[in-house]
Amino acid sequence: MKEYRVYLERARSRQQDFLYPLIFREYIYGLAYSHNFNRSIFVENGGYDNKYSLLNVKRLITRMYQQNHLIISANDSNKNPFWGYNKNLYSQIISEGFAIVVEIPFFLQLSSSLEEAEIIKSYKNVRSIHSVFPFLEDKFTYLNYVSDIRIPYPIHLEILVQILRYWVKDVPFFHLLRLFLYHFCNWNCFIPTKKSISTFSKSNPRLFLFLYNFYVCEYESIFLFLRNKSYHLRLKSFSVFFERIFFYAKREHLVEVFSKDFSYTLPFFKDPNIHYVRYQGKCILASKNVPFLMNKWKYYFIHLWQCFFDVWSQPRTININQLSEHSFQLLGYFSNVRLNRSVVRSQMLQNTFLIEIVSKKLDIIVPIIPLIRSLAKAKFCNVLGHPISKPVWADSSDFDIIERFLRICRNLSHYYNGSSKKKSLYRIKYILRLSCIKTLACKHKSTVRTFLKRSGSEEFLEEFFTEEEEILSLIFPRDSFTLHRFHRNRIWYLDILFSNDLVNDE
């Protein structure tokens, strides 16, 4: 990311922190091209030797300012193949340019905030998906109620642009961004549909994720502000917090509104044990106190989304459940708090007492049914979990087939090694192992029994079960009791930055 700092310093020396001139700089598109964000979008089929042209991008931006930018004469089309109708291709080119330009200043703010907080070395571990589970193990065993909330959408992109204006002061840049969204992404309708959002997110994934994250960051900043105002203890876990234009004015307005209209209700929101976790398009709100406080926070969220972001959310879609009686889905796992009861005999002088001790433990379980559904969708088994062959891979060599199955098995084992019960994970491994055997038997045009006799059933494909033990034996002492104990306990890996489709099938 050193290129970001160089390009922003170059732009500062010319245009006083404005982002608009960066749209017309060739190194911006070269940066997107070299990082392989989407290499195919910079390639035109005719006459460009697999290279993009900044001149064509500038011409397209110029035509965006014209009312008849889609009316292209036949002469222009004959002279230059660029002006043939290929709306999606060049909208993606400009979308990459927008995403790169607008990410530059915020990445620098993020890196400076991390350096000031002295957590730059552990930032990669914090980014890991598995980093949230140790937090849940430490905190959720002391909580009683949980609310699983789906962040509402669709939201009109005009609102996202207005949110972005709180951070950046470049008016021409936002004017061009609005033109791009309205002319190329079909955002002329007043209420966007889920289909239009899905189309835009697939054709412009980087820009869409950036704008969506701004929407989430905005409502979370307000939520954190309300949470801090409702209790005298300051929140210290959010050390990375950006300064925004007009934020203090907005905050003073919120203080005035809540002190005027909610002076008697705010003391009831003093809940020091409320915890908030966001993942993908959902968030979890957990608390130790009575459901009354959770219900108040639920309506806080609903009114915040409806009044501040014009996003409709139904109160009945947010349920409040007891942790001991409810399982919630989190990043491909089923999680709940289990009550462990034990009886201890205590003796005092001549009297003996039986004391019942109740302890809580967070259970994180592999969701076997969604995983089997994902394997069936990928044609590794049927809907009942019976392994089937993969004839599409039959043209590959035996080594490639085994390596493909091992890679899938290794990734699933790596991701689900934090499960408290490994039986479901072993079942998934067994399905993949038999599917691999059936695929090889199908390739060699023989039955499974004949193929196993020929290759040796005792030693064939033992890597499906022995690879994990070999890795653990390199990390921990070669003691059978130690390895058995680590098989029973959870192991979280802090190098997992994303989940694949098999994990994320909800």
Curated annotation (Swiss-Prot):
The UniProt entry, under PANTHER family, shows: MATURASE K
* Top-level taxon in the UniProt lineage: Eukaryota
Q: Which organism is it from?
A: Trifolium beckwithii (Beckwith's clover)
**Gene name per UniProt:** matK
Report the function annotation for this chain: Usually encoded in the trnK tRNA gene intron. Probably assists in splicing its own and other chloroplast group II introns.
Going by the UniProt record, its keywords in alphabetical order are: Chloroplast, mRNA processing, Plastid, RNA-binding, tRNA processing
UniProt record similarity statement: Belongs to the intron maturase 2 family. MatK subfamily.
Molecular function terms in GO for this entry? RNA binding
The main place the protein resides is plastid
Compartment(s): Plastid, Chloroplast
A GO biological-process term? tRNA processing
Q: What is this protein called?
A: Maturase K
